[in-house]
Structures are given as structure tokens and as C-alpha cells.
Regions:
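C-terminal PAP-associated
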Residues: 21-369
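Bacterial Sec-dependent N-terminal signal peptides
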Residues: 1-23
Length: 369
């Protein structure tokens, strides 16, 4: 059971605690012209060949080293007992089966509910596979389909993300490509999840491992694991119209001790929009005993917040800022060291699980109350 906690008044604090650290985009990409694509269902009852989905192409890279060994203090957020749930259990509205086993491990499921539909996506042998469900009944709307059948963007490789853009009543699907360092994005042309999509393919300088995506009024944003953590801004306004769209890339300093590391984009949810002109946000945690040994705070670790003011008309006016370090209770990132992907034991199996110590879990959600 995981401890639940709340970061209170997070974005109110950001307004009052901006810093002077600014970063311009280190790469501005040429406009990408979309193609129009349509859903092509796969044949029901045909299963993929068993395989392990190896998306660790960039996860086993050398860690950013420091000269002082990591230090350890009491982990105050380590929950060692089961607490009774303090809130009543809500009545279940709907329960239905999603996509079946594709014989791919891990499945990396992703899903999102919109006004009328729910879309689920998982890894398949030929890249990501998704299926659309009626949100009122749970009934499938057509057969499952592979992302790569949506058009001529080439073969997909997985790590799907499904996003519902409530501000525009549109759907956005993404996965990385099997051909080079590319990300494939599909934006629905209408609110119909089973209608036509615009397909965009953006090339990144490195393989975009562990991609995570967010929606914000000023753009679509995604992060990935490419060494020094990058974040990308996509021209949402152009993509919603099916027009040629550009991408900008920014990076933040890597943290010593980790090899695999990535920011998590903050996704807008709810009905009250962020304040006009509010920047997009990105977050990560910092265990300063692990990343700053010998020069650390023994009472707290931190959540770091970055803000991005993106300007697609004048890219040199775009700025990424480190705006806030939120003190939180001490926690310990040393789980079988700082780089092992095989650590957590499980009953009845000799296979150990990846502790995923390096990243904040997706999604990090923004609500404006």
C-alpha cells in the first residue's frame, strides 16, 4: 500500500518563488507536415508471438557519477503497516474487459476517458495496440488496431500514451517508432475517437525512451529518457488544425547517481483552465543524499518544478526556468543501489521487479480550483 500525500498550494507558491535560471531551446525543429490516417482493425483471435518488450535501450547507460558516496538518513515516508481506508468506497459505475493478452511483457497499459469514449493502449509485437470503448456501456467500438496501421509513419515500437484533450475535445495517441529516433503522434480530426486522425512524426537526437506526454493550453509536451533529461514542446494549435507543426527541445541538468532519468510533464485536468499565460510545468524528485552527497539537507528531500514559456512564432523567446524546490519528507532512492533494474522480490517468483526509483509516476496532474 502506498502512502498518499498532497502537494498543497503548489502552483500558488510558484507564482511567488520564480528564480532567475532561464534556458533557451537547444534545438528548434523544422515544421512537420501531417498525413491523414484512418483506423484499420486487426483480425480478432490472432495473437502475437511471445516476446519481451525491451525498451531499455537508453536505460542501461552509465550513471552520472559523483565523487562522494551516497548518504542515508531515516526514510520517514516508508509505510510499514496497512492503514484502513479513511474514505468510503465509491459505487462502481462500469466494469468491462479491456484488450486481452498480447504476449508482450511488460504491457505498458495506457488509457484515458473522454466525453463519449474510453481508449486503451498496450504494447504489442508490432508496436502499440489500442481499442476504443463506449464509455456509457463499455462495449467495444470496432476491433483493436495497431498504431502503425493508422498511416505511413512506419512501424511503431510501443510505449503508448493515450491523451484526451478536453479543451479541444480531441484525442492524441503516441508511441516511439521502430525506425530510428522518432516519435509518432496521432491527433483526431474531430471528437470521434474512431474517425480520421492526423499523423505527425518528429525526429529526436537520441532514442526517446520512456516517453510521457501532457496537454496544456500552450502546447502538447513530452519528456523522455535520453541522458541529460530533455523536454519537448509541440505546436498544439497547428496540430489541431492538421497544419505543419514545429517542435522545440530543452534540457535540464542531469542528477548525479542516476543513469535512467526523466522529467514528468504536468498534465492539465478539470474544467477550470490555468490562468491566462500560465507556463507549462514539469517535475522530478531529488534525493539530495543520493545526488548531492556531502552537501545536502538532512531534514528534507525535494520536488523540483520547472516551467516552460513556449513561443512557437519566435523560438528564441521561449524560456525554461527552474522555479521551485518543494521540501518533502526524507526518502531513500538507494534501492539495490541507484541503477539496478532488478531489485524488488515477489512471492512465488525468482524474478525481481524494477523499483522505478528514478521518476515521478505518470501522471502528475494540474487542477485549478
Amino acid at each position: 500500500m502506498r502512502t498518499k500525500f498532497t502537494l498543497s498550494a503548489l502552483f500558488l507558491l510558484i507564482v511567488c518563488n520564480t528564480s532567475a535560471q532561464f534556458t533557451l531551446p537547444d534545438m528548434v525543429f523544422e515544421p512537420v507536415t501531417p498525413i491523414t490516417v484512418y483506423l484499420t482493425p486487426i483480425v480478432e483471435g490472432v495473437y502475437d508471438e511471445p516476446r519481451e518488450f525491451n525498451n531499455f535501450l537508453k536505460r542501461d547507460q552509465p550513471a552520472y557519477v559523483h565523487t562522494t558516496p551516497p548518504m542515508h538518513y531515516k526514510d520517514n515516508v516508508w509505510q510499514q503497516s496497512i492503514n484502513a481506508e479513511k474514505t468510503p468506497v465509491l459505487n462502481q459505475l462500469l466494469n468491462f474487459n479491456g484488450i486481452g493478452n498480447t504476449n508482450v511483457s511488460p504491457p505498458d497499459p495506457s488509457g484515458e476517458a473522454g466525453q463519449d469514449y474510453y481508449i486503451q493502449a498496450v504494447n504489442g509485437a508490432s508496436g502499440a495496440r489500442f481499442r476504443i470503448f463506449d464509455k456509457a456501456t463499455g462495449n467495444p467500438v470496432g476491433a483493436a488496431a495497431n498504431f502503425s496501421t493508422l498511416g505511413t509513419l512506419g512501424s511503431g515500437y510501443g510505449d503508448p500514451i493515450v491523451i484526451y484533450d478536453a479543451m479541444a475535445d480531441r484525442w492524441v495517441l503516441s508511441e516511439f517508432s521502430a525506425n530510428g529516433n522518432k516519435m509518432n503522434f496521432y491527433v483526431s480530426q474531430t471528437s470521434a475517437a474512431n474517425g480520421a486522425y492526423w499523423g505527425y512524426q518528429f525526429t529526436t537526437p537520441n532514442f526517446p525512451d520512456y516517453p510521457k506526454m501532457s496537454v496544456w493550453p500552450t502546447g502538447y509536451f513530452f519528456t523522455s529518457n535520453e541522458g541529460a533529461p530533455p523536454l519537448y514542446a509541440l505546436d498544439r494549435e497547428k496540430m489541431l488544425l492538421g497544419q505543419p507543426a514545429t517542435m522545440q527541445r530543452f534540457t535540464v541538468p542531469a542528477m548525479a547517481g542516476f543513469g535512467f532519468q526523466a522529467l514528468t510533464p504536468v498534465d492539465f485536468d478539470g474544467t477550470n483552465l490555468p490562468p491566462a499565460g500560465a507556463p507549462a510545468y514539469f517535475a522530478r524528485h531529488r534525493d539530495d543524499e543520493a545526488h548531492n552527497p556531502g552537501n545536502n539537507n538532512t531534514a528534507n528531500d525535494f520536488i523540483e518544478i520547472y516551467s516552460l514559456n513556449v513561443n512557437f512564432t519566435t523560438p528564441t523567446a521561449s524560456t525554461l526556468s527552474a522555479v521551485l524546490k518543494i521540501p518533502v519528507s526524507e526518502f531513500d532512492s538507494d534501492l539495490c543501489g541507484l541503477t539496478s533494474f532488478s531489485c524488488i522480490t515477489q512471492q512465488g517468483s525468482n524474478t525481481k521487479l524494477d523499483p522505478l526509483r528514478e521518476v515521478l509516476m505518470y501522471k502528475v496532474q494540474y487542477r485549478n480550483f
